[in-house]
């Protein structure tokens, strides 16, 4: 286990610039990676698709898919070498979690036991402070012990927790997924929601948020739901809002099914300018026989920046 880093709110002065490097994998060329979920009209993941079933378009220009994988990265790929899966878990341990922490811990541990394909797991506990530690796949027992030992107290540095995780994930090559559990809004962070959305847009992390908001009045609950949904959709992820803690297992099982059904698409952009600019990406399906299909992925990426590159 790596040592735990404790970060106070004033230390989380985060910017977008360091995250631009994580838009590509360093493989001799700049390979841009997109995690894609395809669902039917009932929201169930569609599996068994091939590279030929997809079309990737960047700023209106079709791109050639050079990397393709479905589901568990350990099971190999159809194009390219397998990319490792880096999993992040961010858990709200603020004072308001005192009554619910046992049920939340139990659901998280069940989820971890069902996810054996991750190369490592980064645990982020957040209350007044943010604590982050990373565990190899062989250290799951230590990770579970760490989850169980946290005691709820303090405020909620929610935005800072995600921002700190994103900066740590910038040094990782591969697929990156962050699951966040919270029971409320931010009350402590140094960064704002707008700044966090910029960080999420600049990352290649897929965010899943579970918000248990039943203690809020309806107007405040609606506002919180909209914020969490916006955060998740910025990355191609999802937000979930269980009405009871008894529903947590079902939510985590749904996330696990989606992770197992995700497609990983990679390509080398035909635009060779390293100008740091935003590039809009669309993923389409070349399967007329599949009706009412929804495709979820991030909306684009920032190109890498190298000084002297023309615009």
List each model region and its residues.
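Bacterial N-terminal signal peptides
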Residues: 4-18
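Scaffold/interface architecture of coatomer-like assemblies
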Residues: 20-311
């Amino acid at each position: 286990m790596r040592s735990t880093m404790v970060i106070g709110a004033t230390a989380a002065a985060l910017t977008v610039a360091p995250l631009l490097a994580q838009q590509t994998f360093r493989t001799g060329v700049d390979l841009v990676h997109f995690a894609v979920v395809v669902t039917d009209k009932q929201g169930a993941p569609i599996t068994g698709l091939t590279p030929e079933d997809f079309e990737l378009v960047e700023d209106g220009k079709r791109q050639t898919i050079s990397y393709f994988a479905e589901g568990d990265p350990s099971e190999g790929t159809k194009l390219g070498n397998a990319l490792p899966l880096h999993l992040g878990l961010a858990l709200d341990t603020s004072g308001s979690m005192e009554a619910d922490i046992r049920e939340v811990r139990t659901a998280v541990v069940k989820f971890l036991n069902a996810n054996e394909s991750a190369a490592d797991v980064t645990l982020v506990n957040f209350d007044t402070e943010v604590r982050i530690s990373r565990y190899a796949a062989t250290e799951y027992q230590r990770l579970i012990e760490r989850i169980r030992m946290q005691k709820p107290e303090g405020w909620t540095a929610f935005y800072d927790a995600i921002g700190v995780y994103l900066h740590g994930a910038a040094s990782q090559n591969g697929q990156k997924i962050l699951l966040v559990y919270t029971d409320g809004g931010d009350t402590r962070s140094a960064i704002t929601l707008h700044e966090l959305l910029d960080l999420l847009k600049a990352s290649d992390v897929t965010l899943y948020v579970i918000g248990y908001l039943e203690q809020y009045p309806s107007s405040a609950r609606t506002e919180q739901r909209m914020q969490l949904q916006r955060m998740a959709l910025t990355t191609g992820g999802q937000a979930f809002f269980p009405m009871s803690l008894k529903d947590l297992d079902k939510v985590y099982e749904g996330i696990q099914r989606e992770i197992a059904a995700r497609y990983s698409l990679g390509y080398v952009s035909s635009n060779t300018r390293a100008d740091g600019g935003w590039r809009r990406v669309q993923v389409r399906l070349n399967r007329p026989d599949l009706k009412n299909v929804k495709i979820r992925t991030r909306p684009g990426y920032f190109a890498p920046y190298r000084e002297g590159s023309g615009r």
